[in-house]
Amino acid sequence: FTILANETGDERSGKIIFSNSLYNISSSIDVIQEAKEVEAKGGISTAADLVNFAKAVNNGTSTSRWQNDAGEIVLLNDIDMSSVTSWTPIGDIDASNYTTAEPYVSIHPFTGTFNGQGHAIKNLDCSADITNGGLAYGLFGSIENATVKNLVLGDASTTITWMMSGTAPKYTVIAPLACFAKSSVIEGCTNYYNIDFTADNKSGEFNALSGLVGTIVNTTIGGESKAQGCSNRGFVRTGRISNTANGGTGMQTAGICAFMAKAEGGKLNYCTNYGDISCPSGRTGGIVATLMYGNIYN
């Protein structure tokens, strides 16, 4: 006998009957074919997709299932992350050989194009006791030779505040979009998430806290026109901290970028901060806290 191909992939059921007319006997088997699980192809449409994409990047495995025909990772709609109780950033950082020119080494950074297509990643909460955690807290831990564009984090009605408690390890970076960006472009991105740093930053230990991007090397934030500019609309604030240093060992807090490293190519174009920046630290700025090398255009 022949069973026709299931072209729709829908669940279907049937009965197979075996009979012997000579002895007047028969037997039947009920069969059910479950619906085909369609693999996500061409973009990210659910929180599970985004979590699995992050795992793929962090494991160094293929991300092709989330790429469109142009090879971009794309959001197909707004993504609700309320079901995700513990987020692991996409990519990570190592600060073992920290210098002001090369602050971090990327670990499995995202290296392609991530196009939000104007959609939002909503209800992403990275609140944590950071005492014994990693160094990176954000959507991306690290990007390198990458483009991130047309992406919204949260929305105008968000009530989410990232509550960061404990004592921050040296070189911790907290930034909703990307903690560390090297040789990359970030354009057309907006953040609405708030950051409340109730943790302590120990004296003389560099930490970076930003409403959008933490630390950059040879990276452009904002495009070549106002339409491609980036903005932060969430507040960034800290309580009293032990670190009152004013310099490279101080706490860096800003609305757009906390630390522009001592390397050529850093640029901020058409960036705007609308969020309240309230931080009793040595290096605080509405746009950037420390600019060691680079340019800002508006």
Annotate each language-model stretch with its function:
Residues 4-10:
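Short, surface-exposed loop/turn segments at beta-strand-coil junctions that are enriched for proline
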Residues 10-21:
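A short beta-strand micro-motif common to beta-rich folds, especially ectodomain repeats
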Residues 23-36:
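C-terminal edge beta-strand
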Residues 37-298:
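Surface-exposed repetitive/solenoidal architectures
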